[in-house]
Amino acid sequence: VGLTLPRFLLRQPYSPEDNPVKTFVYNEDVSVTHEHYLWGNSAYAFATRLTESFAKYRWCPNIIGPRSGGAVNDLPLHHFESMGEIETKIPTEVLVSDRREYQLAEQGFISLTMRKGSDNAAFFSANSAQKPKFFGNSEEGKKAELNYKLSTQLPYMFVICRLAHYIKVLQREQIGSWKERTQLETELN
């Protein structure tokens, strides 16, 4: 399970000058509270990264990092006047710092991090909500803990699932037949 946050801006507020409605005149007032903006769940943005990765590569490990498939581009920016100055509403509900993104990732959250000075954001990690197990303080325990932690990250999980799917397809034709281990190894290699 992947839990994403924060919400992101789906569109600029409607106004006759900046973002007009085609069929009637409407001025959407967002000056009172930021809840009046149209926010979207970042799970949908994450789903676009998954589908784009699958469309390009036929599997889903390329979903994190701004240059490796994790970027959500062309998000709307709302420019407005406040106290005589032009301000810009960032496209994510809150600005998640690099440090906070790391802390959230360690707790199992997938955060959409706005890239400063741009109209895009990116997913920099994709940990699952599964808490890593503790295997002790020995060297073997630390290695096992790291291995378990890596196996709970979604990009690695998607690779393993795709390989398992591929092996299942290969072996589907062999259902009901009896083969030795060496014969199966030869077919898979």
Q: Where are each of the predicted segments found?
A:
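Small-residue-rich
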Residues: 1-20
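Long, contiguous, structured domain-core segments that constitute the functional module of a protein
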Residues: 15, 19-184
